[in-house]
Regions:
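Extracellular/lumenal carbohydrate-interaction signature centered on repeated Trp-anchored short motifs
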Residues: 1-7, 62-69, 103
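Residue-level recognition of well-ordered beta-strand positions that form the cores
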Residues: 10-12, 25, 74-76, 85, ...
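Surface-exposed loop/edge segments in extracytoplasmic proteins
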Residues: 32-34, 57-59, 91-97
Length: 138
């Protein structure tokens, strides 16, 4: 993911088992990455971002009203930061998280899905788009 670009992934949210998840994955190294998406945790879909730079943290907010709808996760890389935004259907993007990131780093990006507590999770991805970075960080 070059600097001054944005990546979006859109998928239908149909998660119903603990830790089902999908979204966007940005990788610098095995111990330095960002995972942004929706994870089914504690009985409800949670919009969240995990940031790992040797240690990890997770920010999350419940979005039960997103179940069964199209979710878009957007990562915009500009200057020394990545801005994570998300939306459901055609609603406006909402700011989720601002993550510092050295502009000299090479970043690989891709969609992801994960179901660590079961087999057989299927996620319907609708689009993968690269555009210009957002004008504002937040």
């Amino acid at each position: 993911m070059p600097s001054e670009t944005a990546i979006e992934v859109t998928f239908t949210l149909v998660f119903d088992e603990q830790f089902d998840q999908g979204g966007l994955f940005l990788r610098v190294a095995a111990d330095h990455w960002i995972k942004a998406g929706v994870e089914y945790a504690d009985g409800t879909p949670q919009l969240g971002v995990v940031v790992t730079d040797r240690l990890s943290d997770w920010s999350a907010a419940p979005v039960p009203e997103w179940q069964g709808r199209k979710v878009t996760i957007r990562a915009s890389r500009s200057g020394d930061a990545v801005t994570i935004r998300a939306r459901v259907d055609d609603e406006p993007f909402r700011f989720v998280r601002l993550v510092p990131l050295d502009p000299s780093l090479t970043v690989d990006a891709g969609p992801y899905l994960c179901a660590p507590t079961r087999s057989g999770l299927t996620v319907r991805f609708h689009s993968w788009i690269q555009t210009a970075a957002d004008d504002a960080l937040h």
